[in-house]
UniProtKB/Swiss-Prot annotation:
GO terms for molecular function: D-tyrosyl-tRNA(Tyr) deacylase activity; Gly-tRNA(Ala) deacylase activity; Ser(Gly)-tRNA(Ala) hydrolase activity; tRNA binding. It comes from Acinetobacter baumannii (strain SDF). The gene is dtd. One of its GO terms (cellular component) is cytoplasm. This is D-aminoacyl-tRNA deacylase. InterPro entries: Daa-tRNA_deacyls_DTD, DTD-like_sf. The lineage of its organism: Bacteria, Pseudomonadati, Pseudomonadota, Gammaproteobacteria, Moraxellales.
């Protein structure tokens, strides 16, 4: 499981010209699920993301998490994060969880995230999404 998180001033996801999720300040989270991933592993990663201190505190240091910064979370599934890229010139998506299993786990993780944090928006699993964002920093981290 991999999460690419970006601190944003705003972000939104569109599918077929319709906005499916939108936040102002907060975290844009791209989430990739691998064959061996579990709900428990995902919950631990979500907890880490929600507690990860990458927002400026009163001293201008990265001391606040998304809740303390009064931000939102935009959660977007992205199987390409699981690609093996060490060999050749074409990504190998073999390590990614099969779509039917990944959809079920992704939906459980969305539900879990919403149980832990109030302002959670999402894309649509496996849809052709257009993601618009304004990076803040930029500040980007790859969490596993």
């Amino acid at each position: 499981m991999r999460a690419l998180i970006q601190r944003v001033l705003e972000a939104k996801v569109e599918v077929d010209g319709q906005t499916t999720g939108e936040i102002k300040k907060g975290l844009l989270v791209f989430l990739g699920l691998g064959k061996e991933d579990t709900l428990e592993k995902g919950q631990k990663l979500i907890d880490k993301i929600l507690k990860y201190r990458i927002f400026d505190d009163e001293q201008g240091k990265m001391g606040w998490n998304v809740s303390q910064a009064n931000g939102g979370v935009l959660l977007v599934s992205q199987f390409t994060l699981m690609a093996q890229t060490q060999k050749g010139l074409r990504p190998d998506f073999g390590p990614a969880m099969p779509p039917s299993d990944a959809k079920a786990l992704y939906e459980q993780l969305v539900e879990y995230t919403r149980s832990q944090f109030e302002n959670v928006q999402t894309g649509i699993f496996a849809a052709d999404m257009k993601v618009h964002l304004i990076n803040d920093g930029p500040v980007t981290f790859n969490l596993t």
